[in-house]
């Protein structure tokens, strides 16, 4: 048996005990077969992503069964070996509806405008066109995976892609409240567009992480104890470090140099 698939099913069963294992196995097997064939036979395969990586990204968001199936099959439509009619017969109308929404988003040629108003209009267009929020969640998960593949494509293309992600998809992730994707996309885009600044902040934050985590854990415990003492025993308190891009922007707004140690402590 496939260990990756078995682990995924175990994760899904935690929140969706009635999941149809055979249905997901069928979609997974199909996606792996076509993915491996594309990698082997397509000349320009640097930007082909593995569908199961998209699914792995999604699991923490507790997607339903149709969403998982659609995530497995989404990029396979480009192979020309899979058609919506066949997918509907095998997996149902719900999956086809998600895939059609993803195809619409994928077909949009995103143009990076200078005008903030035009950018906002484009973001709204994405939100209007994706009437099912699950479509955007899958699409954002794909963007996270694609950002990892940018090192293997020419720098002018990777910079254009990273700029598009920061201008369009990061705000969408924020509007949907998916802050994990927001921070990942911001930091990956920042690394591509401003590698030197990224390296400085990465080094600086790395020196402070242990001290910062100890402080966050200490304060979290104090707050948790406080709530518990006042009858709120189920309250969970946690903290996190800011993303590199967020630190960069805050320091920029304050006019502070990147190597200003004191400011890093404030994050």
Regions found by a protein language model. Give the residues of each.
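Hydrophobic or amphipathic alpha-helical targeting/insertion segments
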Residues: 73-107
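Short, mixed-charge amphipathic alpha-helical segments
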Residues: 12-27, 84-94
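Alpha-helical scaffolds flanking conserved acidic
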Residues: 49, 53, 64-73, 94-98, ...
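Conserved structural-core and active-site-/substrate-pathway-adjacent residues in large, well-folded domains
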Residues: 31, 71-74, 99, 142, ...
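Nucleic-acid processing machinery
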Residues: 1-16, 33-40, 48-60, 79, ...
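Short, well-structured alpha-helical segments
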Residues: 21-32, 48, 96-103, 186
């Amino acid at each position: 048996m496939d260990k990756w698939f078995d682990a995924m099913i175990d994760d899904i069963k935690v929140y969706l005990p009635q999941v149809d294992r055979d249905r997901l196995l069928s979609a997974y097997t199909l996606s792996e077969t076509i993915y491996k064939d594309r990698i082997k036979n397509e000349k320009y395969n640097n930007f082909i992503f593995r569908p199961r990586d998209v699914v792995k990204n999604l699991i923490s968001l507790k997607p339903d069964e149709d969403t998982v199936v659609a995530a497995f099959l989404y990029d396979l439509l480009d192979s020309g070996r899979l058609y919506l009619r066949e997918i509907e017969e095998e997996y149902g109308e719900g999956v086809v509806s998600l895939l059609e929404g993803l195809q619409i988003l994928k077909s949009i040629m995103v143009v990076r405008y200078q005008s903030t108003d035009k950018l906002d209009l484009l973001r709204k267009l994405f939100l209007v066109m994706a009437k099912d929020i699950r479509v955007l969640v899958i699409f954002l998960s794909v963007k996270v995976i694609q950002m990892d593949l940018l090192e293997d494509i020419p720098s002018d293309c990777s910079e254009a892609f990273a700029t598009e992600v920061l201008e369009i998809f990061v705000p969408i992730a924020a509007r949907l409240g998916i802050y994990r994707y927001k921070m990942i996309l911001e930091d990956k885009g920042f690394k591509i567009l401003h590698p030197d600044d990224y390296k400085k902040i990465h080094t600086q934050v790395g020196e402070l992480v242990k001290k910062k985590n100890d402080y966050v854990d200490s304060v979290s415990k104090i707050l948790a104890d406080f709530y518990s003492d006042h009858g709120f025993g189920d309250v969970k308190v946690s903290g996190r470090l800011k993303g590199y891009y967020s630190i960069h922007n805050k320091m920029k707004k304050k006019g502070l140099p990147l190597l200003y140690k004191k400011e890093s402590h404030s994050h």
